[in-house]
Structures are given as C-alpha cells and as structure tokens.
Amino acid sequence: MRKLLDKLYKASGFLAAGFLVLICAVVSAQVVLNLITKIFGTAYSFTIPSYADFAGFFLASASFLALAYTLTRGGHIRVTLLIQTFGRIPRLAAELFSLSFGALMSAFATYYMIRLNIESFGFGDLSFGIIAIPIWIPQLAVSGGLAMLTIAFVDLIWLTLRAGRPVLKNMDSE
C-alpha cells in the first residue's frame, strides 16, 4: 500500500509538471506567433484561439495536482517558529491537529468540487472563449488534485500516529 500511495503522489506531481510544460508551450507558441506578425506584418497574423483560457486551465490543473506531492515532500509552508519550542507530546498534538484540520477541509473541498464537476457535466456547462470547452474537463483535474490531497492528509495522520512523532520534514532543513 505504501508503494502505491507513493506512486500516486509522484504521478500527481508529474502530471502537475506536465501541465506547467503545457503552459510554457502554449504561451511560447503565442509569443512566437506575435513576433511573426510583428516582423512580417498582418498578412502573417496568427493566433492560438483561447490560448489564455487553456493556460488558465493548465495552471489550475498544475496547482491542484501538485498539492499532494508537495505536502508529502514537506514543501508546504509550515510555521515552525512556535512549534519548535514545544515538547514532544504538545508538538505531536499540534501536528495531529493541523493534519486532521487539513484533512477535514480538504475532504470538504473535494466533496463539493466533485459535486460541482457532476453538475457541470449534467448541465453541459461550457467555458467562455473562442473555443468552448466543456468545463467539467478542467474541473476534473481540480477534483482529482483535491482527492489526492485528502488521501495524503489521511496517510500522513496514519504515519504520524504510527511513528508517535511528526513525520513531515521541512524542505529547507534538508
């Protein structure tokens, strides 16, 4: 089970990185097309329809798919100034409280995002723009990212309880 979860977190991180590459590709292609228009005039004026919409969808996908991977690698911002003064038991309690609160909030967001996803699919909602995309498609990555984050929080709660100490390390301390 541990290997499966780690592979899921990595896959989510790789998907997020892939969406960042897509943002770079779409925006770079549009910049090149703008340069061609500038150099050769409006006779060679080309544009990628809805490129800003696509870049926005890719950004939302990358952001939410990266959450679980970043959390499990200790990359999220953590306030250690206060908790480093705690003893072992209060620090463990603070860690479990924050992980549990994160899991509850993430589960809440996941539930309602999936409901929104289903409604968007059912109503046939489309994005605004030159190319109308069924909005449930980009919402799917957000739902998946939130679901992965919820799983990661529950996983970290379990690992913390089993270890009897906080298991997350800050990336800046490595």
Enumerate the predicted regions with their spans.
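Alpha-helical transmembrane segments and membrane-interface helix-loop junctions
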Residues: M1-E174
